[in-house]
Amino acid sequence: MSFNLIVDQGNSACKVAFVRNNSIESISFLPGKAGQALSHLVAPHRFDKAIYSSVGLPDEEAEAIVRSCAAASLMMGTETPVPLRLQYDRRTLGADRLAAVVGAHSLYPNTELLVIDAGTAITYERVSAEGIYLGGNISPGLHLRFKALHLFTGRLPLIDPSGISPKIAEYGSSTEEAITAGVIHGLAGEIDRYIDDLHAKEGRSAVILTGGDANYLARIIRSGILIHPDLVLLGLNRILEYNV
């Protein structure tokens, strides 16, 4: 029996999970610097273990809260041991990317994995069936592609992807439709190419999709995938259990 606190500090928000016996019990979203809000959230509880991870500079107040509310705690850093072998410069690997691949490997061991995290950027991570992180690629995300076409051209309008149907014409009949079709078909083709490369490998394989745009992207790509929206949190919990 274990009751763990997982604090994942992003660039603009903080995600907090209560994990009981390796299952996520609840998830809370806190604003940027989560200090006081985090203190109120965890005050009624006493945790067995806790982990704090940040994609940027750590919040010292949040770190202190995490340390104080659990019997044992871990501050995620570039030297933190993980249950994978890495073929990547650890100093340049974001904590969220690393946690995602650890989470995927814990869910699907002995499997060739492609982990796709679809947020502001889209990351493609490869994990071998032997538990080796083979590396990854970073590409512009869905919203970023639309925004770049608007910002770096003279007259192209900004398209809001939130209202776009998954059924996109092959070719647009207006500038708006042309932008939409170009971005969506281009991104779908990019993702399908990575998936095809994975499935060309021998043995069991799986594609794991996570991130804010995961549900939409799942509808526009032709290949079978598994959606795990809380993959980073699961990975951080696995790293915590591995170390403490």
From Swiss-Prot:
Record GO terms (molecular function): ATP binding; metal ion binding; pantothenate kinase activity
Catalyzed reactions: (R)-pantothenate + ATP = (R)-4'-phosphopantothenate + ADP + H(+)
Record: active site: 96 (proton acceptor)
EC numbers on record: 2.7.1.33
Family, per entry: Belongs to the type III pantothenate kinase family.
UniProt pathway annotation: Cofactor biosynthesis; coenzyme A biosynthesis; CoA from (R)-pantothenate: step 1/5
Location relative to the cell: Cytoplasm
Cofactor comment text: A monovalent cation. Ammonium or potassium.
Gene3D superfamilies: 3.30.420.40
Top-tier EC class: transferase
Name of one Pfam family that matches: Pan_kinase
Function: Catalyzes the phosphorylation of pantothenate (Pan), the first step in CoA biosynthesis.
Cellular compartments per GO CC: cytoplasm
The keyword Endoplasmic reticulum is annotated on this UniProt entry: no
Binding site for substrate: 88, 94-97, 175
Matching HAMAP family: Pantothen_kinase_3 (MF_01274)
Binding positions (ATP): 8-15, 120
Cofactor(s) the protein needs: NH4(+); K(+)
Subunit structure: Homodimer.
CDD domains named in the record: ASKHA_NBD_PanK-III
Protein name in UniProt: Type III pantothenate kinase
PANTHER family for the chain: TYPE III PANTOTHENATE KINASE (PTHR34265:SF1)
Chain sites annotated for binding K(+): 117
Any single biological process term in GO: coenzyme A biosynthetic process
Assigned keywords, A-Z: ATP-binding, Coenzyme A biosynthesis, Cytoplasm, Kinase, Metal-binding, Nucleotide-binding, Potassium, Transferase
Domain of life, source organism: Bacteria
